[in-house]
Amino acid sequence: MADKITDEYAVGIDPEIYANNPAYSSLFNPYIHKQTIIADHVSVQCHIDLNGIDAVGSKFGNLNAHAGNFTSLCAPNCLPERFALVAYTVEYAFLHDDETDNAADQEALLLENKMLHQALNQSGMTSVSTRVSDKAQRKSEVQAKIAAEYLRLDPVFGEWFLNKWQTFTACVKDVRSLEFPSLDDYLEFRIVDAAADWTLYNFRWGSGITLTPEEEKLADPMSYVAYAELCLVNDLFSWDKEYASHIKSNGDVPLVNAVHIVAVTQGLTHCAAKAVVQAEVRAHEERFCQLKEQYEATDKPSHEVLRWLRLLEHSMAGNWVWSLCVPRYCKVDRNPYKDHLEKYGSDAVRVLTPLDRLCWSKQEIKEMKRNQLKEPSSSTYKTHFSPLEPNPGPEQTRLTISQTQQQRPVLNPYTYINSLPSKNVRQTLIAALNSWYKVPVKSLLIIEGAVNFLHNSSLLLDDIQDGSVLRRGRPVAHQIFGVGQTINTATYLMNEALYLIQMLSPSAVSAYTDEMRNLQLGQGRDLYWSYHTHVPTPAQYISMVDGKTGGLFRLISRLMRSEATKNSDLDISQFATLLGRHFQIRDDYQNLQSEDVTNPHIVSLYAPRANMLLQYTKNKGFCDDLDEGKVSFPVILSMQSPGFSNTALSSVFKGSRKGETLSLEMKQYMLEEITARGAFSETKAVLRKLHTELLSLLMETEKKAGGVENWALRLLIMKLDIVEEKKVAPPKSDSHWGVNQRRAWKGGQKNGRPIDKACFLRAMEEALQK
C-alpha cells in the first residue's frame, strides 16, 4: 500500500544541499514542490501587501535561497490551485509571529491577536477610526484576503480553519509565567503554542488529503510524534538566536525553548542540553517510523492516512533542511526577498489576486441563469440621489450621546440594544469602503456614529412592529422598557443621527433624507403585506427590500463618498443595493432553517419534541417569521408555485396575526409545504445568483478604483454565502496532546522517555561528560 503513494508535484532536492552537512541527520529525504516559484512570489507579495514595497525583506519568513521555500519543502504535493494561498498564509503567520514575539507585554500581545480576530471574523470590531492608519489598513486587508480566499475555495474547511486560527491566538499565553517540570510537559504546550497542528492541517488541506474522524483518531499518535519532532527541530536551530535575544534584553525576553527546558530540568549546560534535544529528535523520528510500520501492517490501511503520513515525513525533512541556513535563524550574505523582487519585479509576484480570474465556473453561471428570477432592474426602484459636493464639516462633533440626567431615560432602550451581540455588517462595510474613499478620521467617526444610531433605531421599531419576543437571544427592548418609551427612543436616535450628519457636507444631508424616505416606504409596504396577508410578487418584494434594507447600505456608501479624499467619483450604489437584497433574502432563508431543519432531508424536521423545544428557545426563536405572519421570500415563492393550493397556508398566516405563537406542529406543517414546493431550493438559487453578481460587480468596482483590491468587502460577501453541499469538515483539533503523547510512546518508554533507543542513551552519556 505504501508503494502506491505517489508524489505528483514533489521532486527530490539536490543532495549536495544537505547530505554532507553534519547538522542534517533526519531519517527522511527532503522534497520540494515543482512550482516553488509560486510560493516565492506570494511570500514577497505578502510583504508588499503588509508594509509596502520599500519594506520587502525587513523581516524573514518562507524564503530560503539555500534550500528553498518553507511551504514548498513542507508541502511539496500541495495542489496547484491551493498552493499560492497556503504559502501566502504561512508567510503571514511568520510575520504575525514576529509581531507577537516583539509585543512589549501581554496587553500588547492580546491587542495584536484581537485585531486578527476582528479581521477574520468581521465581528466585535472596535471603532473604524482605530483602523485608519496605513499599517492597520494594510494588515486588515491582508487578513481579509486570507479569510476570503479560504471561504471561496472551500467554505466548510475555510470556516473551520479560520475558527481554529482565532481559537489558537485567543489562547496564547504570556510565557514568562509558565514553568515546565519536564520536556514532555513542554512539548504538550509547544505543539499548541507553535501552531503545529494548525500549520499541518493547512498543508493537509492544500494537498487535498481528507481524513474521517475515525482515521484522524488512528493517526493521532503518529501526528503527535511528527508535531513534536517539528517543534524540537525548530527549537534546536532557533536556540542561538533566542538565547542572544534573551541576553540582550537582560532577561526580559523569556527562554521558551526545548534546549533551555532540558538544561533546567536535567541540570545540564546548554551545550549538553542541545545534544539531548538532538537525540530526542532522532528518537521521535524513529518512533514515527515504528508506528507507521505497525499501521501499514494492519488490515486495509487507509490510503488517505498513508498520504497524511507521507506529508508528515515531507514536513519533517523539509523543516530540517530549510532550517540549516535560513535568514530567520542566522545571518546570510544576501537578502532573498530583495533579490527575488529585483529579479522578477512587483507585478510578477502578484499571484494571489482576484482580478485575473472569476470566482465561479461557467457551469455554476448556467445553473444560476436557469433558476434565476425575473428581478426588477436597478432602475425599477428609484432612489433619490443628489449631486455629491464634499465640503468640510464644522469643528464641533457629537460622536456619542452624552447621558445627562435629562437624557438617561430616553437612552435606556438604546443602551440595552447596543450592548447585545452584533454581526457588525454595517461597521464592516464602513471600514471596507474606507480602503477606497480614505475619509478623514473626524468624518469617519461621524458616519459611524450616525449609522449606529439609525441601525439601532430601526431594530427597536422593527421588534415592536413585528411583535418579536427575542432579539439576539435576549428579550426585546420594548418588553423591558415599554412600547411607548422604546418608540420615543427610536425617533430620538433618528434625530441624533441627523444632527451628526449635518456636520458633514450638504450632500450628506440629501443622502440622509433620500434613503430614510426609501427605508420608511419599504418598511411600510412590508408591514402592509403582513397585516393584510397580501402575497406580493417576487419583483415587488425585492423592490421593497431595496428600500427597507438596501437604504441603509446605500446611505453608508453615499456618506462615505460625500467625504472622500480619494475616488470621490466612485459610485457604488448598485453594489449597496445588491448587498441589501442578498442580506435580506439570506436572513429570510436562515430564519426558516435551523440545525434541526435542513433540506432536502425533511426527516430531520421530526426530531423528538425535546430537541425541538431546545431549538425553539435558542437565539431568536424557531422560525419566528412564521409567528409574526411575515410574508418572507421563501413563503412568496412557495405560494406562487403552480399546481398547489394556497388555501391552507393563507389560513395559517391570517391566524398568526392574532398575536398567538404557532405550535411546533403547525410550523412543521408549513415548512414541509414550503419545502415540497421547492421554495427553499429556489431561494438558494437566487442567493447564488446574487452572490455571483456581487463578486462580479466588486471586481468591476476595484478596476474603477484604480485596481485597489477590497478584500474586506470580498470577505463580507463570502461570509454571506450559503454553502450548498454538506462536506465532512476536518475534526476540531483541540484534542489533548498529552493523551496522544502517551498513546504514541505506549510500550516504549520509562518516565516519559524512550528506553530502547541506543542513540538517545549515547547522547545522554556524551552530554553528561561535557
UniProtKB/Swiss-Prot annotation:
A motif (NSE/DTE) lies at residues 234-242. The keyword ATP-binding does not apply. It comes from the Eukaryota. A motif (DDXXD 1) lies at residues 97-101. Its EC number is 4.2.3.-, 2.5.1.29. GO terms for biological process: alcohol biosynthetic process; mycotoxin biosynthetic process; terpenoid biosynthetic process. One of its GO terms (molecular function) is prenyltransferase activity. Substrate binds at residues 97, 101, 190-193, 234, 238-242, 328-329. It catalyses: isopentenyl diphosphate + (2E,6E)-farnesyl diphosphate = (2E,6E,10E)-geranylgeranyl diphosphate + diphosphate; (2E,6E,10E)-geranylgeranyl diphosphate + H2O = (+)-penichrysol + diphosphate. Mg(2+) 2 binds at residues 97, 101. Coiled coil: none annotated. The keyword 4Fe-4S does not apply. Residues 5-335 are annotated as: Terpene cyclase. In the N-terminal section; belongs to the terpene synthase family. In the C-terminal section; belongs to the FPP/GGPP synthase family. The conserved DDXXD motifs as well as the NSE/DTE motif are important for the catalytic activity, presumably through binding to Mg(2+). Hexamer. This is Cyclopiane-type diterpene synthase. The gene is PcCS.
